[in-house]
Amino acid sequence: MKITSKQLRESWLKFYESKGHVNVGAVSLIGDGTTGVMFNVAGMQPLMPYLLGKPHPLGKRLCNVQGCVRTVDIESVGDASHFTFFEMMGNWSLGDYFKKEKTAWTYELLTTVYGLDGDKLCSTVFEGNDAAPRDEETASLLRSLGIREEHIFYLPKSDNWWELEGTVGTPCGPDNEWFYPIDPEKADPVFPDDYVEIGNDVYMQYRKTENGYVPLENKNVDTGFGLDRMLLFLNGLHAGYKTALFAGAVA
């Protein structure tokens, strides 16, 4: 499947609008001063008040494509898949649907809309610790969708738990990350060496406190998929800098 960045943005929004989401649009790359960071680092950052329970004027199902600066990845910039600036394709549930709907929609979008081979998808889930249980619910849903048992991996908090580091009061929880082989034509690719993360579904079930975590009153979903990485796979390329986004800038 060949696709332009414009077509990818439009197809992402169209898919989630068909599931009852409203496009909230992108905000400035510069932080608004309320979150203590200079730049927007994730699509969910401007939505923090609503993820914590404030009603959003456009409803409980939202989507957009947001420009982000991710300085935490700066040492990895220059490889096949990391960028200082990138566009995050996102969608959110604010106390509405949860894991069952989200895993099904992500799988549908990747395989039916974008044509990725479901047999080659790998997915990781939270292995659990003293603060939160193993995410067997998500693993079971992945199996029901057809993800192969040997392609589902349980990983620790450092890999499959999302939170804003050091920020007390913010929502957090286990995430379900999706991976695809950097070279889909390679026979028997090995995880993780031959795979690249293309996106993740974060299940915000908790609020971070000084002493740990407490359950959120409303469970939220925060999804983020990198437009740049999706372009790589959908256009049969092996490096993000080969996409049309960098034409004229990278020889």
Residue ranges with predicted function:
Residues 1-251:
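Alpha-helical segments
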